[in-house]
């Protein structure tokens, strides 16, 4: 049986992550408060950020920048702004 969490991003109950995907206290916070659906949304945004801003995950500054964006997206309700990207209209 899957576990459920009240997702901080989506503001609703959802299926929780199967295991802690990120290290440390932040990883624990994500595991306890973020649903699989919200995590999948973040992964999509993360890929766009890495590609568009040409981030190098070996660079500690780039990792810190990505972590800040992740916290803003998952916990503060801020969307990721990618310069020059226009989402497709519905």
UniProtKB/Swiss-Prot annotation:
It holds the Pfam family Iron_traffic. Keywords: Iron. GO terms for cellular component: cytosol. Coiled coil: none annotated. GO terms for biological process: cellular response to oxidative stress. InterPro entries: Fe_traffick_prot_YggX, Fe_traffick_prot_YggX_sf. GO terms for molecular function: iron ion binding. The keyword ATP-binding does not apply. HAMAP family: Fe_traffic_YggX. Belongs to the Fe(2+)-trafficking protein family. Could be a mediator in iron transactions between iron acquisition and iron-requiring processes, such as synthesis and/or repair of Fe-S clusters in biosynthetic enzymes. This is Probable Fe(2+)-trafficking protein. It comes from Vibrio campbellii (strain ATCC BAA-1116).
